[in-house]
Structures are given as structure tokens and as C-alpha cells.
């Protein structure tokens, strides 16, 4: 595991910057070697929708899911996001491939796809970059 850039902060622009840095590094990610866009900012001031998008994209990037919030005082919404077993399963898929952008159907929209273990299995995310 290695960091790919700067320290993240709890702002949507910082989350986007981390995603943009990681976007072209898929060939370096895989079992035993992970691109680390930094810890999660979920529950630290982003909106609930931004928190969901942030957590989901870290999973699509096969990034380490390291909670940066105070788990002793997190809200029920934050806990639900951080413990979403389906999203965690995508992140932890044993194939370990990082998602890539496969289409940009609009100014602020990206479609990401990630190959998963199993026959012809993929995770797909529609990522809205807008706030």
C-alpha cells in the first residue's frame, strides 16, 4: 500500500482531487499492492450523499477503507455508510482490480467499471461529480 498524493480534507473538492489522482493508476493496483488515496472523510462534514459517493468510489478504486472519523460519536447515517456490506464486498473483492472510467455521458457524470472475481462479474458506478 502506498499513498498516491496529498492529505485529504473533509471537502468535496478534496475527495474529487483524490479520485482524479487515482484515476490513471489502475495498472498499479492489485492484490498485495494498493493505491491509497488517503483515509475516508465520511462523517466529518460532507453531506450524506457526498459521504455515500466518497465511500462508494473508494470501494470502486479498491482503496484501503480507513475510517478517519471518531467512531465513538458517529451518527447512525455515518455508521450505515461505513458498514454497508455490499460496498465493502466490492472493495474487498479478491481479484483486486481497480475501477476505470468507461464513459463520460455528461459534464459532471462518469461511469466507472471494475472487474470482480467470478465469471463475467463487474461492479459499475455512475459517479456524479457535482456537489
Q: What does each model-found stretch correspond to?
A:
Residues 1-70:
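Glycan-recognition surfaces
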Residues 2, 40, 60, 82, ...:
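Generic structural hydrophobic/aromatic packing signal, biased to beta-strands
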Residues 3, 28, 35, 42, ...:
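Generic hydrophobic/packing signal
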Residues 5, 22, 36, 84, ...:
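Intrinsically disordered, low-complexity peptide-like regions
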Residues 9-13, 17-21, 68, 87, ...:
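Mature, folded catalytic cores of secreted/periplasmic enzymes
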Residues 10-12, 23-27, 41, 73, ...:
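Low-complexity, compositionally biased segments
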Residues 53-104:
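Catalytic cores of secreted or luminal carbohydrate-active enzymes
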Residues 58-61, 66-68, 104-131:
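Carbohydrate-binding surface patches
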Amino acid at each position: 500500500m502506498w499513498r498516491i498524493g496529498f492529505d485529504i480534507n473533509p471537502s468535496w473538492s478534496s475527495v474529487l482531487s483524490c479520485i482524479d489522482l487515482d484515476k490513471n493508476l489502475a495498472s498499479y493496483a492489485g492484490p498485495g499492492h494498493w493505491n491509497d488515496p488517503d483515509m475516508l472523510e465520511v462523517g466529518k462534514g460532507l453531506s450524506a450523499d457526498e459521504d455515500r459517493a466518497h465511500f462508494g468510489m473508494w470501494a470502486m478504486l479498491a482503496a484501503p477503507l480507513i475510517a478517519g472519523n471518531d467512531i465513538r460519536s458517529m451518527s447512525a447515517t455515518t455508521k450505515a455508510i461505513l458498514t454497508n456490506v455490499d460496498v465493502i464486498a466490492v472493495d474487498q473483492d479478491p481479484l483486486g482490480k481497480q475501477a476505470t472510467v468507461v464513459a463520460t455521458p455528461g459534464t459532471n457524470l462518469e461511469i466507472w467499471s471494475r472487474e470482480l472475481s467470478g465469471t463475467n462479474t463487474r461492479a459499475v458506478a455512475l459517479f456524479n461529480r457535482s456537489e
